[in-house]
């Protein structure tokens, strides 16, 4: 075991004395040591429940014969960081998370890892670390927030931004805005639409690095605690079978993730993070891959902000696996890719069922025949730009020439 480098032999007696200081028993020092990367904090709504997820993972690891050891990862709430200088500090945390997790894992010689992320830069940062370290690794996220309800309709954080705009336009009162403010984010979890956090958690599942439901089971459901226990058990099974992160994160699985991205209508930020993850395995992947895949991948979901459905609806409709089954049935996925279950994507999704064709459109009745993202190039963006095509209303999909309004700050 890798951990023997830090625990075994006379030379490591000083290290064992420090393990004794931590309360480790002699029996525990003979077992695989599993690092659990906890992104728990009390400033990000998507991370408020991570401590409970981590405790469940620990139980699963111990049940399967490993020794769970928790260490932290930082996480920023982009929603709270937005609108001031704090937003300049968000993206850099992705690489800080990757680098610091690498440092902790190698310094302490862990045999395997369970990553417990949830929000925007936290998920890709830990995926980058997983690919870099190439240990047996399973992801289990904190899960999505439930949608809020305002005046009888489901709402999410994007509704809050729209409410502020309506107030500025004089079409909504201050009391109306306050009602939105108090109701659109009713629980812990990553914001309830298909924004960056939920996009990346769903793509983690599509990559094969998370168990079924990783991207969609709501944060407050007991089912997520069970998922976390199973993640702890799964990483021990991977350890015994010597299935490592780079057996799962491959060129083919990244292309699968991009295909699922197009079908789900994920965040444009996925085109910032997938290339960074690909870089860790030596795959030269950039935004030029997007349009060819988009052209052949139907957009099957219109989750908020593109439409009136939310992550809880996607979960009830069959989740990411149901979307993948639709895509696999028309030959758009590499179904032989390995996953954290020890089975292939094809085996995992074989029995997946689309339980709500209004939430997950069948491939023969998509929202559009092309994917949710598109890359545009021109004089405004000579190196390319990404647009969430699935969230653009039809009347805006026209050829128009006009004067650009360029500003130093908005």
Located regions from the model:
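A short, small-residue-rich loop immediately preceding and capping a beta-strand
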Residues: 104-126, 137-142
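Short, glycine/acidic-rich beta->alpha junctions
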Residues: 96-97, 118-122, 252
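Well-ordered alpha-helical segments embedded in enzymatic catalytic cores
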Residues: 96-103, 125, 256
């Amino acid at each position: 075991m890798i951990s023997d480098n830090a625990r075994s032999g006379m030379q490591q007696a000083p290290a064992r004395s420090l393990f004794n200081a931590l309360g480790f028993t002699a029996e525990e020092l003979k077992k695989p040591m599993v690092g659990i990367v906890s992104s728990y904090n009390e400033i990000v709504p998507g991370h408020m429940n991570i401590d409970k997820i981590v405790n469940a993972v620990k139980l699963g690891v111990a049940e399967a014969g490993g020794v769970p050891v928790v260490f932290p990862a930082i996480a920023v709430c982009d929603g709270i960081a937005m609108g001031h200088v704090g937003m300049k500090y968000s993206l850099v945390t992705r690489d800080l998370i990757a680098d610091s997790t690498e440092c902790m894992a190698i310094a302490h010689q862990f045999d395997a890892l369970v990553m417990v992320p949830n929000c925007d830069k936290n998920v890709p940062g830990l995926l980058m670390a997983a690919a870099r370290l190439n240990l047996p690794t399973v992801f289990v996220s904190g899960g999505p927030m439930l949608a809020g309800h305002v005046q009888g309709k489901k709402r999410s954080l994007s509704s809050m931004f729209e409410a502020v705009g309506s107030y500025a336009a004089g079409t909504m009162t201050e009391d109306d805005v306050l009602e939105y403010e108090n109701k659109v984010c009713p629980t812990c979890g990553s914001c309830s639409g298909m924004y960056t956090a939920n996009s990346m958690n769903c793509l983690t599942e599509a990559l094969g690095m998370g168990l079924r439901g990783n991207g969609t089971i709501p944060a407050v459901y007991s089912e997520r605690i069970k998922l976390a226990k199973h993640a702890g058990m799964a990483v021990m099974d991977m350890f015994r079978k010597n299935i490592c992160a780079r057996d799962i994160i491959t060129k083919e699985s990244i292309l699968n993730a991009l295909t699922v991205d197009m079908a789900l209508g994920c965040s444009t930020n996925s085109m910032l993070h997938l290339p960074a993850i690909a870089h860790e395995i030596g795959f030269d992947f950039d935004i030029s891959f997007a349009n060819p895949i988009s052209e052949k991948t139907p957009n099957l979901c219109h989750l908020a902000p593109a439409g009136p459905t939310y992550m809880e609806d996607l979960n009830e409709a069959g989740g990411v696996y149901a979307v993948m089954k639709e895509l696999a049935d028309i030959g758009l996925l590499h179904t032989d890719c390995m996953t954290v279950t020890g089975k292939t994507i094809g085996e995992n999704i074989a029995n997946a069922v689309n339980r709500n064709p209004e939430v997950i459109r069948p491939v023969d009745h998509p929202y559009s025949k092309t994917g949710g993202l598109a890359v545009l190039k021109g004089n405004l963006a000579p190196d390319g730009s990404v647009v969430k095509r699935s969230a653009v209303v039809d009347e805006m999909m026209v050829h128009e020439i006009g004067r650009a309004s360029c500003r130093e700050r908005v």
